[in-house]
């Protein structure tokens, strides 16, 4: 009996062009897979994902960028269905970390082979994330970038302008981190929480070799002013971030972030939203079944 799959395509993703849904359907048919395609707007992905997750298909496939994949994955957490990935976004960090090919035909070949593993998922105040979450500088950059894009600016131009503006006006955060029976008071421009550990060397910066170690990795830069942040960016590109004196890296399975404010802007997998403080993070080990290439 052929596999039955449902494909959720984010029509607004970076690489979605006219005819892509027909191409996807044709490639699945060639692989002997019965695929039902849903092309949806970004605002409706969570609703469609919940509906499809409750259906009768064997596999639910997210076709889009990391935000799309994260939303679909959230509907499948701790459930029996497998997640398939078609990387159609701009960066596609999640699919790259899993070793999934970046072209659609090859990614469909991986789905057809149906080799699955279980991976961890992060959780902040009940919201899941597959890559990372952060507070401070980055979510404010994303918010301003989206405002500029709505005014007709290109994505990369808007991101660069928003980053420069935030470097000029962003206040430092004063936070208290509670983890592993310890409390750390910090003044920082950001707190970055990864689902498992990120590589910091020059050739693999921003990559994750494993997504099944059951840890949150926490990164922050203690207050040194904005020139300190510029220095950090340069050191990041040189693969020297861990040698930065005021850069901190922690690992835990649960983290609470307290602050004076009652609400704060939070990024999860590149999507931003306001959340109530305190922020309660935890790792959910082996919570998601995902299709990946077989290990050689």
What are these regions (language model features)?
Residues 1-60, 70, 296:
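ATP/NTP phosphate-donor binding region
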Residues 8, 17, 22, 27-31, ...:
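Catalytic core of DAGKc-family lipid kinases
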Residues 61, 84:
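Short aromatic-hydrophobic micro-motifs that form the base-stacking/packing surface
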Residues 62-66:
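N-terminal glycine-rich "phosphate-gripper" loop used for MgATP/nucleotide binding
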Residues 68-81:
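Short Gly/Thr/Asp-enriched flexible loops that form oxyanion-binding sites at enzyme active sites
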Residues 134, 192-206, 272:
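Glycine-rich phosphate/pyrophosphate-binding beta-alpha loops
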Residues 149-157, 202-228:
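Gly/Ser/Thr-rich active-site loops/lids in small-molecule metabolic enzymes
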Residues 179, 185, 210, 220-296:
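ATP/nucleoside-binding phosphotransfer catalytic cores, i.e., glycine-rich phosphate-binding loops
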């Amino acid at each position: 009996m052929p596999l039955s799959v449902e494909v959720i395509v984010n029509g607004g993703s970076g690489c979605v062009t006219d005819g892509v849904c027909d191409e996807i359907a044709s490639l699945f048919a060639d692989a002997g897979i019965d695929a039902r395609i849903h092309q949806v707007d970004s605002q409706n992905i969570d609703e469609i994902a919940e509906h499809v997750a409750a259906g009768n298909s064997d596999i639910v496939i997210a076709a889009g960028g990391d935000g799309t994949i994260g939303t679909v994955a959230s509907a499948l957490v701790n459930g029996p269905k497998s997640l398939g990935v078609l990387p159609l976004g701009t960066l596609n960090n999640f699919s790259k970390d899993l070793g999934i090919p970046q072209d659609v035909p090859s990614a469909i070949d991986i789905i057809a082979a149906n080799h699955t593993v279980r991976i961890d998922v992060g959780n902040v105040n009940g919201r899941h994330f597959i890559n990372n979450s952060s507070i401070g500088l980055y979510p404010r950059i994303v918010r301003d970038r989206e405002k500029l894009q709505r005014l007709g600016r290109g994505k990369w131009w808007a991101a660069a302008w928003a980053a420069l503006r935030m470097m000029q006006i962003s206040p430092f955060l004063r936070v208290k981190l509670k983890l592993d029976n310890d409390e750390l008071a910090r003044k920082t421009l950001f707190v970055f929480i990864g689902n498992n550990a990120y590589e910091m060397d020059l050739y693999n910066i921003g990559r994750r070799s494993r997504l099944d170690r059951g840890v949150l990795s926490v990164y922050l830069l203690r207050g040194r002013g904005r020139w300190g942040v510029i220095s950090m960016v340069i050191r990041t590109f040189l693969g020297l971030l861990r040698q930065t004196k005021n850069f901190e890296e922690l690992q835990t399975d649960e983290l609470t972030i307290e602050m004076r404010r009652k609400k704060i802007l939070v990024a999860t997998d590149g999507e931003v939203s306001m959340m109530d403080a305190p922020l309660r993070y935890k790792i959910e080990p082996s919570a998601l079944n995902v299709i990946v290439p077989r290990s050689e």
